[in-house]
């Protein structure tokens, strides 16, 4: 947050998303409201609504930010076929899991309750599936590895493997 003498505090859209992420990590997705974000950022509700018209818009922006970061990790590595791709997917998942906890995951689960958000997520996964396509044994093994990674991710974010014994891969 930036302050100037004689003026109310101002904060950028990205700054608000940073504060929103912190709120979710500390208090969970249900604590993320326009009012709570305004209070945490030290600005008015109108200041938040200037950047995010609704809570849904705010949550969608958070998920888009996370997805963009994850996609950037995938695209940073040149991949030649399903095996290389799944290796980069595993590395990106490992990196992103270090920043993810059950409270953040709860927000993502609630995000998927909206049919439009679910459609967007399905479209994202279709892009992943396309990169794992093929009839070769390597492509099939890459798909099995993908399913295993996704299963480990679900165990971790749902708090089933609290100590990370099974999900530390």
Where are the language model's segments positioned?
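Alpha-helical DNA-contacting segments of helix-turn-helix folds
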Residues: 59-66
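Hydrophobic alpha-helical connector segments
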Residues: 68-105
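Helix-turn-helix
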Residues: 15, 19, 23-57
């Amino acid at each position: 947050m930036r302050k100037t003498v004689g003026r109310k505090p101002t904060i950028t859209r990205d700054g608000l998303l940073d504060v929103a992420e912190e709120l979710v990590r500390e208090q969970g997705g249900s604590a993320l409201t326009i009012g709570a974000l305004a209070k945490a950022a030290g600005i008015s509700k109108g200041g938040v609504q200037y950047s995010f018209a609704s809570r849904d818009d705010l949550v969608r922006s958070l998920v888009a930010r996370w997805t963009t970061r994850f996609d950037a990790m995938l695209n940073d590595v040149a991949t030649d076929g399903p095996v290389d791709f799944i290796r980069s997917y595993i590395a990106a998942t490992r990196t992103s899991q270090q920043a993810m906890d059950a409270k953040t995951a709860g927000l993502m689960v609630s995000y998927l309750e909206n049919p439009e958000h679910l459609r967007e997520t399905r479209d994202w996964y279709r892009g992943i599936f396309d990169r794992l396509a093929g009839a070769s044994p390597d492509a099939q093994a890459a798909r099995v590895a993908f399913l295993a990674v996704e299963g480990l991710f679900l165990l971790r974010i749902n708090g089933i493997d609290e100590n990370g014994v099974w999900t530390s891969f």
